[in-house]
Amino acid sequence: MLFRSVKYFGLPEFAGYRIPLTGEHNQRNAAAVAVCATELGLSRQQIQAGFDSFTGIKRRMEVRGEAAGVTVLDDFAHHPTALVETIRAIRQKYPQRRVWALFEPRSNTTRRNVFQRELTESLALADGVYVTRVDRLNELPEHERLNPEQMVATIRQLGKPAEYSANAEAILSSLTPQLRQGDVVAVFSNGKFDGIHDKLLARLSRV
C-alpha cells in the first residue's frame, strides 16, 4: 500500500487528554489514537469521552486480586521494551511500594538468548526478581538458549534479590514469606505460568 501524503502533527494539539491508564507507553498510544480520531472528524469532547469509557484490556497490568495487602498483577509483556515500560508504569501507579517481578521465558523471543542482556536489565528495574525455567527448552539449539541462572546472577550483582526457580510452586515457597503489606507482585508471561497468580493469592489469603 502506497501513502500519497504525509502529515505532521504538533504535540500541543493533542496534549491534555485524560486517560485511565498509567505509563508513558499508554500516553503515546493515546496521542496516536487522538490523531487518528481527529482525522476521522471526531471532536476533542468525543475523543475524551472515548478515553473516559475505556477500562483497559486483559493481561495488561491487569489486577488479578489482592490478599494480605499484596496486589497481584498479570501482564503479557514478553520482550525487553514491554518489561521496561510496564515496570515503570507499575511504579507510577503504585508509588513507594515494592515491586516483585515473576518472569516466565515462554515466548519465542524470550526463550532465546538474543535478548539475554536486555531482559536482565529490564527485570532489574524491579525490587525483587524470580525467573523460572525456559519453556520447551529442548526444542532450541543449546547455543540459542536463554540462560535464566545467569540472568539471576547478574541481577544479584546489582544488589537486587533474585532467584531462579524451576516451577511456580518453588517460586511461591520462596516468595510468600518475603512479602509484606503494600507489595506489588507482577507476573510476566504470555502463558498461564502454571496458574501462579491464583496460587499466590490463595497462599496469601491463608497468612
Where are the model-predicted features located?
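Conformationally flexible catalytic loops at phosphate/diphosphate-handling active centers
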Residues: 6-11
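The feature captures the short pre-catalytic strand/loop hairpin that immediately precedes
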Residues: 13-15
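A short glycine-threonine-serine/GTX helix/turn-capping micro-motif
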Residues: 17-24
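ATP-dependent carboxylate-amine ligase
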Residues: 25, 32-207
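Short, small-residue-biased leader/transition segments that mark boundaries at the very start
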Residues: 1-2
